[in-house]
Regions:
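Short beta-edge strand/loop motif at the mouth of beta-sheet-based domains
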Residues: 16-17, 36-75, 161-170
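Beta-strand/loop substructures that line and gate deep hydrophobic ligand-binding cavities in soluble
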Residues: 14, 92-143
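Hydrophobic/aromatic beta-strand elements that line small-molecule binding cavities or substrate pockets
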Residues: 19, 53-56, 78-84, 95, ...
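Hydrophobic ligand-binding cavity/cleft-lining segments
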Residues: 1-48, 171
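Intrinsic-disorder/low-complexity, polar/charged segments enriched in Ser/Thr/Lys/Arg/Asp/Glu/Gln
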Residues: 12-18, 51, 63, 77, ...
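A short, structured loop/turn motif at beta-sheet edges
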Residues: 25, 57-59, 83-89, 108-117
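A conserved amphipathic terminal alpha-helix motif
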Residues: 123-171
Length: 171
């Protein structure tokens, strides 16, 4: 059975997503911070999109850039910088691609009994910015986080293979 995800709009500008993963926090954290692992779960498979480029320098001041595309369509980009990186427990980054100003995402990874409670808190610069993002995002987010859970379980089942050394799938 899939782990339950909750999505809650906390205010006009805040969105909180929670999800439990069937893997320890260090594995889930690595999957969020290593480009070779991000490539394996970040894009919902049903979207028909491919991750064309994936850069993540997960350190304070480091930058990330994810570029998605499909065929002849114009690629979409998500990019920003890491504001806080506490290994295996917390990530904070900016989202600088929006037309409404900069959003900030905080993700916490709390390990409980070998599983990870992930809480993702997005703070948008305006109500309009969150309105633009929230429509239709829950299904894609659910699929993406299910893919992350599958990857984390696979990585956890191979304890001799550190997540950072995992071989990425062909893009």
């Amino acid at each position: 059975m899939k782990n339950r995800m909750t999505v809650e709009r906390k205010s006009e500008r805040e969105l909180v997503v929670t999800r439990v993963f069937d893997a320890p926090a260090h594995i889930v954290f690595e999957a969020w911070t290593k480009p070779e692992l991000l490539r394996r779960w970040w894009v919902p498979k049903s979207s028909g999109l491919s991750l064309l480029s994936c850069e993540a320098d997960a350190r304070v001041g480091g930058k990330y850039r994810l570029v998605f595309g499909s065929g002849a369509s114009k690629p979409m980009e998500f990019y920003g910088r890491y504001v806080e990186v506490t290994p295996h427990s917390r990530l904070v980054w900016t989202n600088e691609e929006g037309d409404h100003g900069e959003a900030v995402t905080t993700v916490t990874f709390d390990e409980i009994g070998g599983k990870t409670l992930l809480v993702m808190h997005d703070l948008y610069p305006s109500k309009e910015a969150l309105d633009d993002v929230i429509a239709g995002m829950e299904g894609g987010m659910r699929e993406t986080l299910d893919q992350l859970d599958e990857l984390a379980v696979t990585l956890g089942a191979n304890p001799g293979r550190h997540p950072a050394g995992a071989t990425p799938d062909a893009p």
